[in-house]
């Protein structure tokens, strides 16, 4: 059967109804009916062709091939005039390109042999060499390897990272994925989940960004999860410039992973809470840097300064350094606080609590020593150049200051309130995140704190 000079159908037997304009073509056993339309070939055992609407279809299984793909299905339709095809039941699209590996499995697909675009509207799986896509509705261009995906589709990269959202755009060639609405990006290597209202992932650079109620959930400890919020959260690899010149795609082995969050950073974990305006985490050094009025809480202790550096061991802090002014306050009872301040502060941690503290430069201390009956009845004010303190069960076990300098010890019943606090004392408890959800609470007081000038080791900030 021929139609024009571009459509040919080969069969062993044909029946035709003039009233319905339907031709039915059959093949002998061991053979197939073949439709050829330029670079499109369709094969099946029984082929139906409606000349009235220029539409052919099969119901007993068939195969359609063009220059890009092969499509198998139980039921199929093909229109030579529009080049549109419809496939249903056990649909399998396989790329014929030697440079590509692509398989699409679904129960229904619309496909155009000119554009090589597949439209999916039911549960579908798209498998490529560098990842897998799970979707219930989407458009996939098999020629450009670009996809628009809807209804919370899921992209799983070859390294195990995943990206999902209400709407996704994904480019397989570049490894770039963009998500809109309730997005979730999982970094399985670094055990971090990023959530937000908008975000993207770039596989080649192993980089990602989320914004719009952005949240990072870090679960590497296996026992407790860190919840971190900022306006924008970014993760990426750094590459040494000299090594990146030869090949901008390959990633040298000594790269390091970074996470940067800013502004309005707040985080919560059951044993540690904090805030600042900018935070970065350097994976290779296991270092966390907090800038612009950072404050950290651990139980009834509060530490603040201009910069806080925290060293992480398996996501647990083992030491912290405040190189440009540090202040630690420990709430005792009612309006009483143990306080230590200095130009530089270094603390070590053990079992989730502070174990040792060193303070140097302009050291100032206010202490309320506990009596044998567990009461407090006097307050000590001391200044020196250096301080060293050991802690046990979250309480000061030993304290040493040098060189020795005179201090004052005042009974509480004689003490005036102006000696209760060091000049730089501030208690930021109202700003402390108290739950995972509370990290989103950016209060006016926190915004005002971020606008203040840096702390001074001698000047009052009360």
Functional labels for PLM-detected ranges:
Residues 1-462:
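Structural signature for solvent-exposed beta-strand/loop edge elements and short helix-capping sites
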